């Protein structure tokens, strides 16, 4: 498998600990239009077509999602502007609230939260010819007003609504204590490059993409370190093309002093300074 934009990684899934599995499952199916791919009494895997995107795990912990570092938002990438318009119209006509919208120069994005406060971005990428790509490979992002009415009017009303089959996880944006420290950590461990940085946030990517990961410290310096079973991000999944990439990531994480756990011969997790877990696995098709 060859990844888009000459990337060496692929964002696969976000795995969330949730306090009310039934209500959250209803949100992701009825509001977001994802399908249930597998289900037990304590876990639900949801996706687009046959591709898992969001994995929900029941937790008995009661902390608020935003009381700890972890997920800022998971960014779900629609294959076209028309597909973004369809999901926009569907959610808007259900009167479910959006918390923001923006034209970022390289993408058009809508923002909302699930029922427990996990951030979600729905976006579509503009053609690469429209991106502000600098000579050094950096890709400048902006935050400008979205042509929301134009996009909404493109939307087709379909019942029952199902999100476009080619939808996938586009990037993961993390809430961290120190964005510069976190950015340097992920750049080294996952071999990502700085694409755009401000004092409080950083956007980093593999290859020529605008960002696969972002980190920001907008939540402040006093949030709790993530612990097992806390509501919110349990971990997110990154895929690599071969076993050699996996071994190299483990070595670089160890060199940074990160705790690395091998889950199998083809999968591992590592933990950053804020307790955020990244799971990396070899692509099963390779």
Language-model regions, residue ranges each:
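An N-terminus-focused feature that recognizes amino-terminal "leader" regions
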Residues: 2-61, 68-71, 76
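Conserved short beta-strand elements that form part of the metal-binding/catalytic scaffold
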Residues: 35-69, 119-126, 193-230, 270-273, ...
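Amphipathic alpha-helical segments
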Residues: 21-35, 90, 178-194
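Vicinal oxygen chelate
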Residues: 9, 16-22, 75-119, 176-180, ...
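N-terminal beta-strand motif that seeds the catalytic metal site of vicinal oxygen chelate
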Residues: 1-22, 129-180, 233-236, 286
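Active-site-adjacent scaffolding segments
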Residues: 43-57, 61-103, 110-126, 130-137
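A mid-sequence, solvent-exposed acidic-amphipathic segment
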Residues: 165-191, 195-199, 205
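Short secondary-structure junctions
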Residues: 33-39, 98-99, 191-196, 255-263
């Amino acid at each position: 498998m060859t990844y888009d934009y000459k990337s060496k990684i692929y964002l696969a899934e976000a795995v969330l600990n949730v306090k009310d599995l039934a209500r959250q499952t209803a949100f992701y199916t009825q509001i977001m239009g994802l399908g249930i791919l597998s289900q037990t009494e304590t876990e639900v895997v949801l996706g687009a077509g046959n591709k898992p995107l969001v994995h929900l795990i029941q937790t008995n912990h009661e902390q608020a999602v935003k009381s700890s570092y972890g997920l800022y938002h998971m960014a779900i990438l629609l294959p076209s502007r028309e597909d973004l318009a369809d999901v926009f119209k569907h959610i808007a006509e259900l009167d479910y609230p959006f918390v923001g919208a923006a034209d970022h120069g390289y993408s058009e994005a809508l923002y909302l939260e699930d029922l427990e406060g996990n951030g979600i971005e729905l976006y579509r990428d503009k053609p690469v010819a429209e991106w502000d790509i600098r000579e050094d490979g950096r890709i400048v992002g902006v935050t400008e007003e979205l042509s929301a009415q134009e996009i909404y009017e493109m939307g087709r009303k379909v019942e029952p609504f199902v999100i476009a089959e080619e939808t996938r996880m586009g990037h993961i944006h993390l809430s961290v204590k120190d964005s510069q420290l976190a950015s340097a950590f992920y750049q080294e461990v996952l071999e990502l490059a700085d694409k755009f940085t401000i004092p409080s946030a950083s956007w980093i990517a593999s290859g020529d993409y605008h960002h696969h990961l972002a980190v920001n410290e907008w939540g402040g310096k006093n949030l709790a370190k993530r612990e097992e079973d806390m509501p919110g991000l349990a971990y997110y999944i990154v895929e690599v093309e071969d076993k050699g990439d996996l071994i190299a990531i483990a070595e670089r994480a160890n060199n940074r002093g990160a705790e690395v756990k091998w889950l199998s011969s083809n999968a591992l997790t590592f933990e950053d300074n804020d307790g955020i877990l990244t799971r990396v696995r070899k692509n099963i098709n390779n």
